[in-house]
């Protein structure tokens, strides 16, 4: 090994000899610890040759059939048949028969859920008033702007006000069920 320990930086050592010795040291370090094989160099390379002692062949093993797969394969044809039956019933039934908004009282038990999913903007919160609103309130101006006047109109997506979602858990109410009628009697 040409270069060990400190670098030779004197008047007699040229920069080309220092560079050459660093390359030699790097190669020696990469092959260190391996007697004849490539050492760490072969371990770092992806396409390195397999070690002759570690010639283990990978074996393909057949996995057992999953019971879940059997259940899914049995269920999917049933679901396809049910979908086809529903399509035929929808084609044969009157227009409003499958409309979930229009139900008759003979349908049996019905669960009605009012679900609102939205992101509340900062302008909707009552805690944060803008400086203009607070100055207008403090000035005592009795004239109302067009925005403040509530005129009943058709409810659209733009003007609907949804309830505050921070109220906690939702409340489930049972309306006109046979069980509640029995309790009242």
UniProtKB/Swiss-Prot annotation:
InterPro entries: NOPCHAP1. It is found in: Nucleus. Keywords: Chaperone, Nucleus, Phosphoprotein. This is NOP protein chaperone 1. Residues 121-185 are annotated as: Disordered. GO terms for biological process: box C/D snoRNP assembly. The keyword Nucleus applies. Client-loading PAQosome/R2TP complex cofactor that selects NOP58 to promote box C/D small nucleolar ribonucleoprotein (snoRNP) assembly. Acts as a bridge between NOP58 and the R2TP complex via RUVBL1:RUVBL2. GO terms for cellular component: nucleus. It comes from the Eukaryota. Interacts with NOP58, RUVBL1 and RUVBL2; the interactions are direct and NOPCHAP1 bridges the association of NOP58 with RUVBL1:RUVBL2 even in absence of snoRNAs. The interactions with RUVBL1 and RUVBL2 are disrupted upon ATP binding. The modification Phosphoserine is found at residues 34, 66, 177. GO terms for molecular function: box C/D methylation guide snoRNP complex binding. Transmembrane segments: none annotated.
